């Protein structure tokens, strides 16, 4: 009789553990992963949250439509605007696909405007919050941006990004990361 009660307790415990495991797996899908929220022409909106207790990070990303580069080993570059839910701030960054030249600057040309981003490793960022705001405003009101960068190995790249869809993607990013 004691064995029968003990076996039932083990079966109940195993059943409870299986149900708990399944419940945790369903939550893991949403936590520790980036989720594509939507796509607007050349721009994709992503949402990221490390845990259900953390603030979200949302970002929009685009890849170049045209690439002029003498580096065949280069990874796929991208232009990104990130919004942090916690402090409701936005940041522009560029992934070059290679290590940028040490102490190098990345040049963004949008219409008649030129912006300089500070490079570190394979990423580059605007130099201040004010520059981020100004750059985002210019991106939202333009059609094309060209980005010129130099690699740490003496290679170069000029990437041309379409800004078609950036305004809708930006508004959606702000909506989901309020």
Predicted segment positions?
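N-terminal secretory signal peptides that target proteins for export/translocation
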Residues: 1-11
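Sec-dependent signal peptide hydrophobic core
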Residues: 10, 14-19
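Acidic/proline-rich low-complexity IDRs
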Residues: 1, 16, 23-24
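C-terminal segment of classical bacterial N-terminal signal peptides
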Residues: 20-30
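A generic "folded-domain core" signal
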Residues: 31-178
């Amino acid at each position: 009789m004691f064995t029968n009660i003990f076996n039932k307790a083990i079966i109940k415990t195993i059943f409870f553990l299986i149900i708990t495991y399944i419940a945790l797996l369903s939550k893991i899908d949403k936590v520790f992963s980036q989720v594509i929220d939507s796509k607007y022409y050349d721009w994709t909106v992503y949402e990221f949250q490390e845990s259900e207790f953390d603030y979200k990070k949302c970002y929009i990303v685009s890849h170049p439509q045209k690439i002029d580069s003498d580096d065949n080993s280069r990874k796929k570059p991208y232009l990104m605007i990130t919004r942090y839910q916690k402090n409701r701030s936005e940041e522009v960054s560029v992934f070059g696909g290679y290590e940028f030249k040490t102490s190098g600057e990345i040049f963004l040309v949008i219409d008649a405007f030129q912006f300089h981003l500070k490079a570190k490793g394979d990423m580059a960022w605007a130099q201040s919050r004010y520059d981020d705001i100004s750059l985002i405003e210019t991106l939202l009101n333009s059609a094309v941006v060209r980005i010129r960068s130099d690699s740490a190995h003496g290679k170069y790249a000029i990437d041309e990004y379409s800004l078609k869809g950036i305004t809708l993607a930006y508004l959606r990013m702000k909506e989901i990361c309020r």
